[in-house]
Structures are given as C-alpha cells and as structure tokens.
Amino acid sequence: NVEYGNFRVEKKLNKAQKKYISKVGISLYDNFYVEEPFDNGTTLRIFQTRQQVNTPCLMSGSLPIGTDQIAIDRMYADNNGLTVGDILTSNGKNWTVSGLIALPDYSALFQDNNDTMFDSLQFGVAIVPEESFAQFSEDRLLYSYSWLYDTPPKDEEQVKNMAEDVMTAVNQEASLESFVPRYLN
C-alpha cells in the first residue's frame, strides 16, 4: 500500500482532528519521524517500522529488532560504503545496520520536496522498531501523516480535486507545514 499523499503538521493530531479530516474519504496513518545527525556527517530520517502503508522492501539482511538495530536505505548505504553489520553512531548511540531497504515513498532521496536534486550522500531514510522509536524525545518528532483514499480517484482531475479536499480539511484543523499529494511526489 503506497500512500496517495502525506502532510506534516506542527502538533500531533488528536482523535477529533483525525476524524474530521478523514470525513473527506480517507484513512490516515501516523508516519512520524525524526531527523538524526550521524557521526559520518550525514542525516537519516528515521521512521518506526511501517506496518500498514509505505511498507519497506527488504533488499538484504533483516528488518531491525531490539533497540540497537536500524535498517537503512540501500542507495544511502551504497553511497556511504555501508553494509549489513556496520555500526552507525549518533549522539553517542551505536546502531547496527540490520538490513538494507527501499521505502516506496522515498524512491528519490529528497530531504525537502522543494529540492531540485536528491542527495543520497548526505541524506537517507531508515526504520527502527517501535521500542527504539519510542526512545526519541517527543519534542524531536515531526508529525507526518500518510493517507489512502477510501475510494480511489478515477482520473487525474479527480486525483487533484480529492487532494485539494484533503488539504482544505487539514488546514481547517491544524497548522499545516507541508503537503505532498502523490501526483506531486
């Protein structure tokens, strides 16, 4: 299941806000992340291992388990000379690379969708298990949500109109920081 789009808001949505936004015919999925600087001079956007939408494709190794394992984007690994079993360090914490993955919503590694060139040398994406993700302080979380349409759009015009409805609903409920429908990604 690949998202139809995602958005980021300033503060975590509460149940009432999620319910209101979902009334436009979507299902919302938490897709929170942190941006973690590593000692090798790079930054990884770290997500909790996804279960329902934008699920990882394991290219080699295994998905991370425990609190010291991390699976990283294959292209980021290649460009930084990293392989399964290597150690990455961030803020004094050592992470063992358990696997190399691809995330369907990051086929090109843009840290910001306004960038004109993707950067798989300095930026990458990664996943960690729920118990590892829970160790990040809440004030570091970026509140991103992915959505799927309850009834998929029939044509490009409907794709754009439905995305506009989602954006309007989010704007009525929260402070929108970014909004990326699939057709712009």
Question: What role is predicted for each listed range?
Answer:
Residues 1-185:
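Membrane transport/envelope proteins' first extracytoplasmic loop
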